[in-house]
Swiss-Prot record:
Additional comment: SAH is a product of SAM methyltransferases and is known to be a feedback inhibitor of these enzymes. As a result of this inhibition, organisms have evolved efficient enzymes to metabolize SAH via different pathways. The pathway found in methanogens differs from the canonical pathway, it uses the deamination of S-adenosyl-L-homocysteine to form S-inosyl-L-homocysteine for the regeneration of SAM from S-adenosyl-L-homocysteine. 5'-deoxyadenosine is a radical SAM enzyme reaction product which strongly inhibits radical SAM enzymes.
Enzyme class: hydrolase
Keywords: Hydrolase, Metal-binding, Zinc
Quaternary state and interactors: Homotetramer.
Name of the protein in question: 5'-deoxyadenosine deaminase
Originating gene: dadD
Catalysed reactions, semicolon-separated: 5'-deoxyadenosine + H2O + H(+) = 5'-deoxyinosine + NH4(+); S-adenosyl-L-homocysteine + H2O + H(+) = S-inosyl-L-homocysteine + NH4(+); S-methyl-5'-thioadenosine + H2O + H(+) = S-methyl-5'-thioinosine + NH4(+); adenosine + H2O + H(+) = inosine + NH4(+)
Species name: Methanosarcina barkeri (strain Fusaro / DSM 804)
Pathway(s) where this gene product acts: Amino-acid biosynthesis; S-adenosyl-L-methionine biosynthesis
């Protein structure tokens, strides 16, 4: 007997070898997909009737700062320097481990509700984020943020904590948690420190998550300090490779794109955050043309202000059409691939497609909605019309986290109340 059967669904596999099923069934057992077809002879403990719905791989958010849900709407419509130095950094300085847990749990709740089944996170007090992931049932690739700032003592302390975290949590939560090293950015970490991080990552077989050329300020600072841009510096020290996840990548030259493609670097495109902070427009179309694996991320809620990857997909598709003056740029299915297949590749997880033998991370999207009627093209609807709130069921590792809009994995009201209280108390401490 199977654990779960999802039936009567439009099955969007995202598997290029199989295509979609207009009326299909997905069978799940022991956390994996065991059968996909029109019908099954199997019976199951749980049967989900997905009539008028799409079953698809869960979305993958490849760059966020989960605990920053506590800063949602806290400091908007400000110049970047004022936003960071006058508001975000002072607030972060007052965060406690308990705050990070409550903020991360709120992020997990939001992602379960909006169809994200796995995410990559960089922050601090990361044991608390890992505990939140463990409790929520989601899948995540986590790292402790390392900000050395050319201070050797601080760098040694940060790297020690990063290493401890990598080793403590790798493979935890029934394998749902992966760990990475998280040097913040080339303009906040010295060349020597970045080389040390690369060595430690090699030693532990861990990936690396880094911010890269998010702003023009980084580009100018790197050229002034090193006489070269961030990508060329990282290339020169042997830092880049297919285990590197680079967030933002806005201020890339054509030569930078060539290097990223050659080294197999994974990019997280954070389109809404980049627009909100006026960082610029990442050359996504050029990156994809050069074979760079481009995925999607939301960044933290302080600069987005939510974790809805459906919004991210639509915005990415629209921005790059107008930016290239080409309505055919980033068609719907390609954007869906960025949000699923490419994201899973970036995090090195056996997810992102509905395929026999792969981990059962999938969502059911309710298509019987006014804004989704009529439906001529399912991929188009998912990108241009659907919202995170249309997700009715979320399954991760073969466990139902939300069924028919009811969250089963967490006490939803308590999570929201605890986060609201934590945010209010945090602001009180900041203003004291």
């Amino acid at each position: 007997m199977a654990d779960i059967i999802v039936k009567n669904a439009y099955v969007m596999t995202m598997d290029p070898d199989e295509g979609d099923l207009k009326n299909g069934t997905v069978v799940i057992e022991d956390g994996k997909i065991t059968e996909i077809g029109e019908k099954t002879s199997e019976s199951a403990d749980t049967v989900i009737d997905a009539k008028h719905s799409v079953v698809m791989p869960g979305l993958v958010n490849t760059h966020t700062h989960a605990a920053m849900t506590l800063f949602r709407g806290y400091a908007d419509d400000l110049q970047l320097a004022d936003w960071l130095e006058g508001h975000i950094w002072p607030a972060e300085a007052k965060l406690t481990a308990e705050d990070v847990y409550k903020g991360s749990l709120l992020a997990c709740l939001e992602m379960i509700r909006s169809g994200t089944t796995s995410f990559a996170d960089m922050y601090f007090y990361m044991d608390e984020t890992a505990k939140a992931v463990e409790a929520s049932g989601l899948r995540a690739s986590l790292c402790h943020g390392l900000i050395e700032l050319w201070n050797e003592e601080k760098g040694a302390t940060d790297l020690k904590e990063g290493k401890r975290f990598v080793r403590a949590w790798q493979g935890a939560a029934d394998g749902r948690i992966k760990t990475m090293y998280g040097p913040h950015a080339p303009n906040t970490c010295s060349e020597e420190f970045l080389a040390k991080v690369r060595e430690e990552a090699n030693r532990d077989g861990a990936g690396i998550h880094i911010h890269l050329l998010e702003t023009e300020a980084e580009l100018l600072a790197m050229k002034e300090r090193y006489g070269k841009c961030s990508v060329h510096l990282l290339e020169d020290i042997g830092f880049l490779g297919p285990d590197v996840l680079a967030a933002h990548c806005v201020w890339l030259s054509d030569g930078d794109i060539e290097i990223l493609g050659k080294r197999g670097v994974n990019v997280s495109h954070n389109v809404i955050s980049n627009m909100k902070l006026a960082s610029g427009i990442a050359p996504v179309y050029k990156m994809l043309e050069k074979g760079v694996n481009v995925s999607l991320g939301t960044d933290g809620c302080a600069s987005n202000n939510n974790l809805d990857l459906f919004e991210e997909m639509k915005t990415a598709a629209l921005l790059h059409k107008v930016n290239t003056f080409s309505p055919t740029a980033l068609p719907a299915r390609q954007v869906l691939q960025m949000g699923t297949v490419n994201g899973a590749k970036a995090l090195g997880t056996e997810t992102g497609m509905l395929k026999v033998g792969m981990k059962a991370d999938l969502i059911v999207v309710d298509m019987k909605k006014a804004h989704l009627t009529p439906c001529f093209d399912v991929p188009s609807h998912l990108v241009y019309s659907a919202k995170g709130s249309d997700v009715r069921t979320t399954i991760v590792n073969g466990k139902v986290l939300m069924d028919d809009y009811k969250v089963l994995a967490l006490d939803e009201q308590k999570v929201m109340e605890d986060a609201q209280k934590a945010a209010e108390e945090l602001v009180t401490r900041v203003n004291a």
